Amino acid sequence: MNSQQSYCHQDSLIRRGVIISVIVLIYICLPLSVLIGLIPWNMKFVTLIAGAIVAYLISRLLGYTNLDLGITLRRARPSLIAVAPFTLVFLVASILWLVLGGVRFKPTEDLGFFIFYIFISCPIQELLFRGVLSSLFNSFKMREYIEIIVASLLFGFVHIIYQDAITVVIMTIVGYFWYSAYKREPSLVGVTISHIILGVFTIVVGLVD
């Protein structure tokens, strides 16, 4: 191995180390900190926003563009088409669950929450768990099915803060389909719209908290 190859190898190792640190600290440690009370419950959304900002800035420093992170209107229509079947199926499944199993939670959210959820929370979650995560995973050259599974597990894991196993399982499954759709059409438009539709519906009818 010559000096140039050695430098490139070392640079790759450093890059992967930074990426692993970001994933561990933001995608694992932050939810755990909320769960065990190190971060107050009423600061969970502030924590989400701060984590997303840090992850975004580090991604840009690593050389990823907004296009790489899915922040683009290109392929917006195909991205909407990619999530449409799953969104429809999940809506129907949610209605069936509601009819057969009833309400799980009593909705307490006000208009201000839904404005925040639609315009800030959902877009930020999609940036963090689809756009940024997909770009970071590119450095590891994983098989796509493994990447999708890991990403969906991380998305499900963040919901441990609600201390509800059903929510974690559902979000892991939903995360699998959203990440798969994003890999097919790498624009955040489709997955964000799907997230808003499904999220608002399931919260309003009391299926998730």
Locations of the language-model features?
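N-terminal, membrane-interfacial amphipathic/helix-forming hydrophobic leader that caps
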Residues: 1-66, 78, 203-209
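Hydrophobic alpha-helical transmembrane segments
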Residues: 17-21, 45, 79-84, 115, ...
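Aromatic-anchored segments of alpha-helical transmembrane domains
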Residues: 24-33, 88-97, 152-160, 197-207
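Juxtamembrane helix-loop-helix connectors linking adjacent transmembrane helices
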Residues: 33-44, 64-122, 127, 139
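Membrane-embedded alpha-helical segments of multi-pass membrane proteins
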Residues: 45-54, 111-116, 124, 128, ...
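Membrane-helix interface segments
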Residues: 76-78, 107-111, 140-146, 164-165, ...
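Membrane-interface helix/loop boundary segments of multi-pass membrane proteins
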Residues: 127-150, 180-187
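Functionally important transmembrane alpha-helices
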Residues: 167-209
